[in-house]
């Protein structure tokens, strides 16, 4: 007796009873209505087996008779059975009505529990969404502060000046050199060569040393023939 295994839960006890009394108890499917007073029969026949106590038997029997599949089996005209499956009378109407109310209450409790769980899930999801939204708002970069009108502005870097295009050389004027100063006359306009340039001048006098001319600036000078051009 001491070496027998011990059943720890009411479900294990029900499984044991379904195996020990298959004509009375069932582990699955619709259950048959039990004989009134069947608890005492159980105590007499199985107490001590599997180290079962009265408390364990009572708890297992209460769980079995309050299950939905047992309450579904409490129908008008159904017959109660004893541990060996023998009929023990037809169900009374008050017992059928009591089972129906128990089933409705059990279903209502389950629906209420499901609704409560769904509400908690929605509440948790809403709180999580608000938390994520707050994190996104915190992570959003703030706009840069507007610069005040009187704030010192940093000078912009000057753009490199575009390279000046090389100027085209002035078209060189071609002049005719004076080969014979005797051909000149006083008051005649002429040009005096000074390097690559030619300055306007007026003939004032023709001498043996050259020609005296007056520049537009008013300065007079004697110039040799090789420095005069037309």
From Swiss-Prot:
It is found in: Cytoplasm. Residues 158-167 have a biased composition (Low complexity). Residues 146-155 have a biased composition (Basic and acidic residues). Residues 106-181 are annotated as: Disordered. The keyword Oxidoreductase does not apply. One of its GO terms (molecular function) is RNA strand annealing activity. Keywords: Chaperone, Cytoplasm, RNA-binding. GO terms for biological process: post-transcriptional regulation of gene expression. Belongs to the ProQ family. NCBIfam families: PRK04950.1. RNA chaperone with significant RNA binding, RNA strand exchange and RNA duplexing activities. May regulate ProP activity through an RNA-based, post-transcriptional mechanism. This is RNA chaperone ProQ. It comes from Cronobacter sakazakii (strain ATCC BAA-894). The gene is proQ.
């Amino acid at each position: 007796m001491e070496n027998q295994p011990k059943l720890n839960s009411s479900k294990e006890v029900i499984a044991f009873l379904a195996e020990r009394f298959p004509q009375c108890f069932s582990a699955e499917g619709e259950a048959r209505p039990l004989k009134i007073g069947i608890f005492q029969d159980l105590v007499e026949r199985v107490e001590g087996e599997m180290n079962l106590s009265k408390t364990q038997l009572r708890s297992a029997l209460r769980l079995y008779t309050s299950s939905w599949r047992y309450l579904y089996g409490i129908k008008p005209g159904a017959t109660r059975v004893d541990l060996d499956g023998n009929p023990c009378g037809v169900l009374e109407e008050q017992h059928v009505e009591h089972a129906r109310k128990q089933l409705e209450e059990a279903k209502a409790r389950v629906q209420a529990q499901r609704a409560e769980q769904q509400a908690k899930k929605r509440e948790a999801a809403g709180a999580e969404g608000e938390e994520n939204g707050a994190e996104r708002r915190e992570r959003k970069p703030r706009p840069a502060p507007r610069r005040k009108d009187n704030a010192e502005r940093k000078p912009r870097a000057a753009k490199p000046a575009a390279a000046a295009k090389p100027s085209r050389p002035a078209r060189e004027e071609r002049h005719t050199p004076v080969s014979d100063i005797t051909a000149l006359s006083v008051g005649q306009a002429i040009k005096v060569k000074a390097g690559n340039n030619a300055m306007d001048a007026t003939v004032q006098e023709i001498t043996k040393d050259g020609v005296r001319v007056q520049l537009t600036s008013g300065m007079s000078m004697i110039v040799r023939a090789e420095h005069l051009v037309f």
